[in-house]
């Protein structure tokens, strides 16, 4: 909640895999009092994932917006239309996606798959806050520059009190 407030985030969506633990995640969200704009459940099957992400991010409409704007400019009297058209032809999409941040409640390869699908649909962590669960120990996520910046929750040391560590060695 503090992160949302500090960063002016008003439309946070949750992306939750459609797995047996989805209800636990939903309960935890409710208990945490995180302000949620929408919750989307997705199938982690890679053959279905990208289509689902395209729908969530309004990708087909944003892609069509580029074509429509080029057509509008071609038929206009705008003196700079060639330059504007050339700039539009470099873009994959234009338009709003409807959220300012997303929390991806997934791990490992599934997390990488959904992040890759988001980037494919022209949703960048440079414009939208990508937040995930405690995956800071996964160095491959940290090394992949297209995923950056990606945010991870942490505990408030003052509120947590003493922490006991155990080892099974």
Task: Give the location of each predicted region.
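Extracellular/periplasmic Venus flytrap/periplasmic-binding protein
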Residues: 1-107
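Solvent-exposed coil/turn segments that connect beta secondary-structure elements
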Residues: 17-19, 107-109, 135-136, 155
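Extracellular/periplasmic periplasmic-binding protein-like sensory domains
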Residues: 34-40, 49, 54-82, 97-98, ...
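Hydrophobic alpha-helical
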Residues: 101-119
């Amino acid at each position: 909640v503090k992160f949302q407030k500090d960063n002016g985030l008003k439309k946070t969506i949750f992306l939750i895999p459609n797995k047996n633990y989805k209800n636990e995640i939903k309960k935890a969200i409710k208990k945490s009092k995180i302000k949620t704009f929408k919750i989307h459940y997705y199938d982690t099957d890679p053959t279905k994932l990208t289509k689902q992400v395209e729908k969530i991010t309004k990708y087909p409409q944003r892609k069509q917006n580029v074509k429509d704007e080029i057509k509008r400019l071609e038929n206009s009297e705008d003196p700079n239309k060639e330059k504007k058209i050339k700039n539009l032809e470099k873009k994959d999409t234009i338009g709003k996606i409807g959220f300012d941040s997303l929390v991806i409640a997934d791990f490992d390869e599934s997390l990488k798959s959904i992040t890759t699908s988001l980037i494919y649909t022209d949703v960048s962590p440079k414009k939208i806050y990508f937040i995930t669960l405690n995956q800071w120990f996964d160095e491959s996520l940290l090394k992949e520059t297209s995923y950056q910046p990606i945010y991870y929750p942490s505990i408030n040391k003052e509120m947590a009190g003493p922490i006991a560590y155990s080892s099974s060695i």
